[in-house]
Each structure stands twice: as structure tokens, then as C-alpha cells.
């Protein structure tokens, strides 16, 4: 994959007010499934662990839910937004942290993802791209992370140069856990050079 050295992700804009949502970094995965609970034994105690069970998602993906929200909804179908992570093969992985509950009118779009980040690499041969999502000043994210995504060749060829800000959206292939980009557009980011 081609790549360029990105600016320091720990830099924050000096002398600026709160960030507009249109320039923040973010990544969100929308899923609809059943609220479930399993028991976790830790230091002799049994703790409930609430999660969203989504049919067809890889077994290696765990969609955590907040106990206060999930406990009264055990067994119900709900939609939720999580912070996605992928491995180097562009497959969803690991323990995904919840962001927020989805209103029912948004459920029909799931499984769906969207993000705003900095294009880190493009591999035309493999049909993949990488996007870096960085912490926003005053945000909860403490360290940048990179998502590896699949995309059609025509979309990859149309992307701007590595280092550019992009907004991407696409779908989750449930059986394989792949995130496939279907649409992109240029995006301004808070740490863009002036």
C-alpha cells in the first residue's frame, strides 16, 4: 500500500473554539440484533456482560452494551452504533465499544458503517484502502487507529491522494465481517493545514 507520513495526531488547534461536527474524526458501525447477557467470572465474582448478538457476524466480534441500557431490554431487538475496528485483512475484529442507541427508523440501513478520517494507504491490487481516525480535541478517543476497508477498483482509482480527508460509507458483509466502501466524498478535518 502506498502511504505518506501523517502530521502528529496529538496536535490540537490552538486558540480555536469547540470543533464543528463537520470537521471531526469518527467511525461508526450500525448493527441490529438481540440483547443478550453472558456471565464473566473474575476474581471469584460472577459479572453480567451485556452484548448485541447480530446474526451472521463473525464469532470474533463482540458488540458490548452498557448494562443500564441493556438489562431492561434483555431479549429484545435493538439497533446500536459501535466503534468499529478491523484487522490487516479488512475484517471486523475484537471487542467493539458502544457509541449510542439507534432510533428504529435507522435500523433498515444496518449493517452499515460511515466514517470521517485521513486516507492512509490505497492498494489497487488487493482492492483495499486504509483510513486513520485520530483523536479530536476534548474527545474520548486517546490514540489514533487505522481501519482497513475493501472497495471496488473504480472507487479506489477515484480517491484523492494519500493524506487527504475523506468521508466514507458502506456496508458490512455479515458472513465475512468485511467492511466494503460504497461511497466516498472529500472531507475537511480539524487538523488540515490552513
Regions found by a protein language model. Name each.
Residues 6-46, 108-127:
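Structural detector for short beta-strands of small beta-barrel domains
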Residues 31-35, 74-84, 117-119, 163-172:
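OB-fold and OB-like beta-barrel modules that bind single-stranded nucleic acids
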Residues 46-104:
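Acidic (E/D-rich), amphipathic helical modules within compact regulatory domains
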Residues 47-72, 135-164:
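Beta-strand/loop nucleic-acid-binding surfaces
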Residues 83-112, 171-194:
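OB-fold/S1-family single-stranded nucleic acid-binding modules
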Residues 95-150:
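Extended, positively charged loop/linker patches that create polyanion-binding surfaces
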Residues 132-149, 161-193:
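C-terminal interaction module
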Amino acid at each position: 500500500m502506498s502511504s505518506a507520513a501523517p502530521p502528529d495526531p496529538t496536535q490540537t488547534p490552538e486558540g480555536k473554539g469547540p470543533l464543528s461536527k463537520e470537521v471531526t474524526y469518527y467511525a461508526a458501525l450500525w448493527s441490529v440484533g438481540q440483547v443478550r447477557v453472558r456471565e464473566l467470572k473474575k476474581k471469584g465474582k460472577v459479572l453480567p456482560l451485556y452484548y448485541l448478538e447480530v446474526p451472521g457476524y463473525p464469532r470474533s466480534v463482540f458488540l458490548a452494551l452498557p448494562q443500564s441500557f441493556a438489562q431492561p431490554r434483555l431479549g429484545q431487538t435493538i439497533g446500536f452504533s459501535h466503534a468499529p475496528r478491523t484487522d490487516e485483512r479488512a475484517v471486523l475484529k475484537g471487542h467493539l465499544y458502544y457509541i449510542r442507541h439507534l432510533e428504529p427508523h435507522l435500523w433498515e440501513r444496518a449493517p452499515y458503517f460511515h466514517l470521517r478520517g485521513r486516507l492512509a494507504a490505497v492498494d489497487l491490487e488487493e482492492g483495499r484502502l486504509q483510513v486513520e481516525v485520530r483523536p479530536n480535541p476534548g474527545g474520548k478517543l486517546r490514540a489514533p487507529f487505522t481501519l482497513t476497508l475493501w472497495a471496488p477498483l473504480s472507487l479506489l482509482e477515484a480517491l484523492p491522494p494519500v493524506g487527504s480527508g475523506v468521508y466514507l460509507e458502506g456496508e458490512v458483509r455479515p458472513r465475512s465481517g468485511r467492511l466494503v466502501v460504497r461511497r466516498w466524498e472529500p472531507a475537511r478535518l480539524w487538523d488540515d493545514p490552513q
